[in-house]
């Protein structure tokens, strides 16, 4: 769901949907579904984590094979086929391959600007075991308090002088570093701890009534996106926000994320997420996300549509279909065969024997 929503906001931008219109304001903030992805990632990883040395080896092994093969495959193909990436310096290539491009000024390569979020996600993978180790002897209730405190502190990230003064010459945009988005991860971390509290109290299978009306929470989520897309709330489009505007943007994303994520985490009623096609989309969502920008960059010239000149209703379904097909290929040819070290070894043996 998050991958499709992020694709939609990119299509809306590239086809010139007016961000000052009501629908444009909402579509422009569909990037808040990234917050849902961050929260879901934190929720799944935190609740399944056992913080001892043996588990850490398994944890990092799984994270590497889950993320890196598909990412490297996309970067290599994009470097070879996306014109905007031609002539990239070795520094840019190596930083992109190592998830460190956000730490370089002008570090983004054409067709790969969306990968910044994976740089943030990789830092979370590194930070999470440290956080778990520090809180290993603390109960769920106190962990929730810690996460709430850290989330509040993270809202001050953009106000730090060194961050507020970026980006500038030879300095990257530090607003998009991991601390700036901890609130979004905190939603998932807190949800995991609340789940543990419910398990200990024997009410794990009892739905949380406040979340039974999911449609109402969706309305709040859409209102949060609409509000964040208004000029009085902060700049629209690619204009760099001030520290206060960035903090407001993160808060709105946190509200939207909680409204979308929590009703499904704490109320197990049937939903559209149970449909087979949605389950399959979830399976290929990583490759779908990786490749959708390249697909969009191909669809526009094939249709003879110049950027920012319209065609949203034509470009959107074609970009979805193309991303679905390429994402499926990425999953079948890269993600699944290279899902673990053992699987990768067997795959390479089949290829080169």
List each language-model region with its residue ranges:
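Short hydrophobic, aromatic-rich alpha-helical segments embedded in or entering the lipid bilayer
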Residues: 90-99, 293, 298
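Residues within membrane-spanning alpha-helices of integral membrane proteins
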Residues: 3, 35, 41, 68-72, ...
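Alpha-helical transmembrane segments in multi-pass integral membrane proteins
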Residues: 4-28, 46-58, 84, 104-106, ...
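Hydrophobic alpha-helical segments with transmembrane-like composition
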Residues: 82, 99-158, 178-182, 196
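Specific transmembrane helices
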Residues: 43, 47, 65-91, 259, ...
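Extended basic-aromatic, gly/pro-enriched interface segments that bind polyanionic ligands
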Residues: 30, 36
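Residue-level signature of the transmembrane alpha-helical core
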Residues: 68, 72, 76, 126, ...
């Amino acid at each position: 769901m998050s991958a499709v929503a992020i694709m939609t906001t990119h299509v809306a931008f590239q086809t010139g949907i007016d961000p000052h219109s009501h629908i444009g304001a909402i579509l422009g903030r569909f990037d808040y579904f990234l917050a849902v992805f961050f929260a879901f990632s934190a929720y799944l990883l935190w609740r399944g984590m056992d913080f001892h040395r043996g588990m850490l080896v398994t944890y990092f092994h799984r994270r590497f094979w889950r993320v890196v093969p598909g990412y490297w495959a996309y970067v290599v193909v994009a470097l070879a086929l996306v014109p905007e990436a031609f002539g990239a310096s070795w520094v840019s290539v190596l930083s992109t391959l190592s998830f460190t491009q956000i730490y370089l000024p002008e570090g983004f390569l054409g067709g790969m600007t969306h990968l910044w979020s994976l740089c943030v996600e990789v830092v979370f993978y590194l930070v999470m075991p440290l956080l778990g180790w520090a809180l290993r002897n603390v109960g769920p209730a106190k962990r929730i308090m810690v996460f709430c405190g850290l989330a509040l502190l993270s809202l001050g990230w953009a106000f730090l002088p060194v961050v507020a003064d970026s980006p500038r010459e030879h300095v990257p945009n530090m607003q998009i570093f991991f601390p700036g988005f901890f609130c979004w991860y905190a939603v998932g971390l807190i949800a995991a701890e609340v789940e543990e509290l419910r398990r200990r109290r024997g009410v794990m299978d009892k739905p949380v009534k406040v979340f039974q009306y999911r449609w109402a929470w969706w309305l709040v989520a859409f209102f949060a996106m609409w509000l964040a897309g208004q000029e009085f709330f902060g700049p629209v489009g690619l204009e760099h926000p001030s520290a206060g505007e960035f903090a407001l943007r993160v808060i709105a994303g946190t509200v939207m994320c909680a409204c979308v994520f929590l009703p499904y985490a704490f109320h197990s009623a049937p939903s559209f997420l149970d449909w087979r096609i949605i389950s399959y989309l979830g399976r290929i969502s990583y490759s779908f996300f990786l490749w959708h920008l390249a697909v969009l960059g191909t669809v526009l010239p094939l249709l003879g549509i110049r950027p920012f000149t319209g065609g949203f209703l034509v470009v959107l379904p074609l970009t979805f279909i193309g991303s679905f097909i390429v994402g499926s290929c990425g999953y079948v040819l890269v993600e699944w065969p290279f899902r673990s070290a053992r699987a990768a070894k067997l795959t390479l043996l089949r290829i080169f024997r």
